[in-house]
Amino acid sequence: MQLSLLVGLVCFSAINAKIYFKEDFSDDDWEKRWIKSKHKDDFGKWEISHGKFYGDAVKDKGLKTTQDAKFYSIGAKFDKSFSNKGKSLVIQFSVKHEQDIDCGGGYVKLMASDVNLEDSHGETPYHIMFGPDICGPGTKKVHVIFHYKDRNHMIKKDIRCKDDVFTHLYTLIVNSDNTYEVQIDGEKAESGELEADWDFLPPKKIKDPDAKKPEDWDEREFIDDEDDKKPEDWDKPEHIPDPDAKKPEDWDDEMDGEWEPPMVDNPEYKGEWKPKQKKNPAYKGKWIHPEIEIPDYTPDDNLYVYDDIGAIGFDLWQVKSGTIFDDVIVTDSVEEAKKFGEKTLKITREGEKKKGKKTKKQKKKEKNEKIKKEKMKKRKRANRKKKK
């Protein structure tokens, strides 16, 4: 009976799961669904490509950036806008930086249904921004930014993104109990509570401005032992003249000046004397500033809620182009997102790693050939100079 009930609940959940948007760029009509922004004339151009290495030539086609040092902006509207109130929100997509990106974004933005995608740009309002961002060795993180009460709030935790040349699946799950989870390649990378990990609300408590540390409060756990005295023979110089040094026979005091032996470390040198430490009988521990509750704090059970979700887009800057985005899904079901992402985690990744190894060998070969050519050029230059 219990097993039948469990199966029934799973089936009910699967039947009631809603997919609000899904895109795998597998047909030629993608340009009808995706709108390129005309806000700037020099936005970077997009193309459909499976890249240099892939698992399946058709299934692994995705949206690729093609021009270096460009801003990119493109988006798609949902068939119908929705609210995530009372249910989970799952955003998932794949990213492949096969160009070995040095600086550039790889994130998506979830937006309202009334957004003008033909005029979208970096300042266009959004609900959620999610995905990897890389710039040099210092920035390799996953952005999770929520818009709340006219402000964009960045996550306070540092989530490291993948920085290799292969495809990776990024998943954000926002739950109706105000919790969240970030997954990379189906594995949990971070999780927690929205209120704790973002500065949506003022703190519940603040330090009491009227509280002061007592003047006689001693935080020193150890103090100098006043009975400990410095030994009389303690003070010795750090360096002394080398006793084994001899003045050279050809040394001329009139010509060379007065000879002085070189200095060596003094084996009797003991350094700065410090008295021994003892337990402080007046030690009270570290003083903790008392806190008070603030009247401005009001909890919000709807931190996770967006009433009008109707579009998704890529709005980013890349120094080195070549990133491929694929397998985009927005749903209320973690299971649906997981099923949709299985292709990426199995077929795509396995095929890429086989062909990617070959590509790495080719790169190494090209690098060695380049070094040989440079050496040949140097030899030719050297021979020309000899002839002259």
UniProtKB/Swiss-Prot annotation:
Pfam families linked: Calreticulin
InterPro entries: Calret/calnex (IPR001580), Calret/calnex_CS (IPR018124), Calreticulin (IPR009169), Calreticulin/calnexin_P_dom_sf (IPR009033), ConA-like_dom_sf (IPR013320)
Cystine crosslinks: C103-C135
Location of region: 4 X approximate repeats: 189-253
Region span, Disordered: 193-282, 349-388
Alphabetical UniProt keywords: Calcium, Chaperone, Disulfide bond, Endoplasmic reticulum, Lectin, Metal-binding, Repeat, Signal, Zinc
Region (3 X approximate repeats): 257-295
Subcellular locations according to the entry: Endoplasmic reticulum lumen
Basic and acidic residues compositional bias, start-end: 205-215, 228-249
Sequence repeats, residue ranges: 189-200, 208-219, 225-236, 242-253, 257-267, 271-281, 285-295
Gene Ontology CC: one annotated term: endoplasmic reticulum lumen
Composition bias, Basic residues: 354-365, 373-388
Binding of an alpha-D-glucoside, residues: Y107, K109, Y126, D133, D315
Range of residues in the leader sequence: 1-17
Comp. bias intervals (Acidic residues): 216-227, 250-259
GO BP terms, alphabetized: ERAD pathway; protein folding
GO molecular function terms attached to this record: calcium ion binding; carbohydrate binding; unfolded protein binding
Family according to the record: Belongs to the calreticulin family.
Function field: Molecular calcium-binding chaperone promoting folding, oligomeric assembly and quality control in the ER via the calreticulin/calnexin cycle. This lectin may interact transiently with almost all of the monoglucosylated glycoproteins that are synthesized in the ER.
Name of protein: Calreticulin
Provenance organism: Onchocerca volvulus
Classification of source organism: Eukaryota, Metazoa, Ecdysozoa, Nematoda, Chromadorea
